[in-house]
């Protein structure tokens, strides 16, 4: 393979991995540990 193709595939893989981790953090098991500042304010 060409160098440019390998770099493009590597960068794409990193972006997909980061997006997956962000979604897991936002909606998966760790999301229960996140605090909600709007809920804490309680107007």
Curated annotation (Swiss-Prot):
Subcellular location: Plastid, Chloroplast thylakoid membrane
InterPro entries: PSII_PsbN
Keywords for the protein's UniProt record, in alphabetical order: Chloroplast, Membrane, Plastid, Thylakoid, Transmembrane, Transmembrane helix
TM regions (residue ranges): 5-27
Any one GO cellular component localisation term in the record: chloroplast thylakoid membrane
The organism's place on the tree of life at top rank: Eukaryota
Lipid bilayer topology: Single-pass membrane protein
Any one Gene Ontology BP term: photosynthesis
Entry's family note: Belongs to the PsbN family.
Function: May play a role in photosystem I and II biogenesis.
Record protein name field: Protein PsbN
Organism: Cicer arietinum
Gene: psbN
């Amino acid at each position: 393979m060409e160098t440019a193709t390998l770099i493009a595939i590597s960068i794409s893989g990193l972006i997909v991995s980061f997006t997956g981790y962000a979604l897991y953090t936002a909606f998966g098991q760790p999301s229960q540990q996140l605090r909600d500042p709007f809920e804490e304010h309680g107007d």
